[in-house]
A protein has these predicted regions:
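Short, small/polar-rich loop/turn modules that mediate ligand/substrate recognition or access, typified
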Residues: 93, 180, 185, 247-249
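Conserved glycine-rich cofactor-binding loop
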Residues: 11, 18-19, 43
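Active-site helix of classical SDR
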Residues: 127, 164, 172
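Residue(s) in the substrate-gating loop at a strand-loop-helix junction
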Residues: 148
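Substrate-binding pocket helix/loop in short-chain dehydrogenase/reductase
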Residues: 103-104, 111-116, 217
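Short C-terminal tail/terminal secondary-structure segment
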Residues: 2-4, 248-273
Length: 273
C-alpha cells in the first residue's frame, strides 16, 4: 500500500513542523491526503514558507502557528488556532523538543525547567487540548509522541533530556489507557540518532564537530547511515493511520541498536568532575 488517500479529510497538528522530522511528517500527511495541517515552530519566516509550500504542492490548507513551547500561553494557542480554522483535530504529532546537553553536575535549574517545559509540559497540554476537540467532535483520533532511545536511560551528557523523554513515555501510556473507551489512540516512537538540521547544529555547537562529522558518524553505524526523517515519518504515519489498527499505548524503538544488548559494556566517556 502506498498510503495515497490514507488521511483524506483529516486535519493534523504537527509541532516542530518547520524543519527536520516534524516537517517530513507534515509533508507526508499532506501527500497522503490530509485536508488540513497546522505546523508550529519558532522561526516565522521558515514556518510561513513551509506552510505555503504544503498548500501549493500538496493541495491542503496549511497554517503556521508560531509557538515558543516553553510558554504555556503560546502552547494553548496551537490547537485553538486549528479548531478555529478547521473545527476539528484528527491527528496530533508532538515532534518538537530541545536536546541541550547537561550532566548531573552541570545541568542548571533553568535548563532543567526549560527542558521539562518544552519536552513534557507542552506535549501534555497539546494532548489535552486536542483530545477535548476530538471528544467534542466524536473523533476517533490518533496521537504520536516523538521520544528517544535515550528514554531508556540515556547518555551521561543528556541527563535532563533523557528524563524528559522517559516522563513523556509514561504520559503516553497513561493517556492511551485513559482514552481506551473513547477509541483515541496514543503511541510513541523512541527514535535513535537521526540526520536533521537540528542535529547538525547541536553537533557543531555542543561537540565542536567538523563540517563533515556525519561521514564518520554514519560509517560507524550498523546500516552505514543515520536515521533519516523520511523513514521515521513513515513510521509516524503508520501509527496515525488505520493501518496500525487498534494499536495504542506502544513505545516503539526505531533505531539500529537493540536496547539491553551489546558485546561490550557501556561506559561513560570520562569521569565527571
Amino acid at each position: 500500500m502506498d498510503g495515497q488517500g490514507q488521511f483524506a479529510g483529516k486535519v493534523a497538528v504537527v509541532t516542530g513542523g518547520t524543519q527536520g522530522l516534524g516537517e517530513a511528517i507534515a509533508r507526508l500527511l499532506v501527500e497522503r491526503g490530509a485536508s488540513g495541517v497546522v505546523v508550529t515552530g519558532r522561526n516565522r519566516e521558515r514556518g510561513e514558507a513551509v506552510a505555503a509550500s504544503l498548500g501549493q504542492e500538496g493541495g491542503a490548507k496549511a497554517l503556521f502557528v508560531p509557538a515558543e513551547l516553553a510558554d504555556l500561553g503560546q502552547v494553548r494557542a496551537v490547537v485553538a488556532r486549528c479548531d478555529e480554522a478547521f473545527g476539528r483535530v484528527d491527528c496530533l504529532v508532538n515532534a518538537a523538543a530541545i536536546t541541550d546537553r547537561g550532566t548531573i553536575l552541570d545541568t542548571s535549574p533553568e535548563l532543567f525547567d526549560q527542558m521539562f517545559a518544552v519536552n513534557v509540559r507542552a506535549p501534555f497540554f497539546l494532548m489535552q487540548d486536542a483530545v477535548r476537540v476530538m471528544l467534542r467532535e466524536r473523533i476517533e483520533g490518533a496521537i504520536v509522541n516523538i521520544l528517544s532511545m535515550s528514554s531508556h536511560g540515556g547518555q551521561s551528557f543528556l541527563t535532563a533530556y533523557s528524563a524528559s523523554k522517559t516522563a513523556l513515555g509514561a504520559i503516553t501510556k497513561n493517556v492511551a489507557f485513559s482514552l481506551l473507551p473513547n477509541r483515541i489512540r496514543v503511541n510513541a516512537l523512541n527514535i535513535g540518532w537521526m540526520d536533521t538540521p537540528g542535529e547538525h547544529a547541536i553537533q557543531k555547537r555542543a561537540h565542536d564537530a567538523p563540517a563533515d562529522w556525519i561521514r564518520d558518524a554514519e560509517a560507524g553505524r550498523p546500516f552505514g547511515r543515520l536515521l533519516k526523517p523520511d523513514e521515521v515519518a513513515r513510521a509516524a504515519a503508520f501509527l496515525l493511520s488505520a493501518e496500525s489498527g487498534l494499536m495504542t499505548g506502544s513505545l516503539v524503538d526505531f533505531d539500529q541498536t537493540v536496547n539491553g544488548c551489546g558485546d561490550s559494556p557501556a561506559m561513560p566517556r570520562a569521569a565527571l568532575g
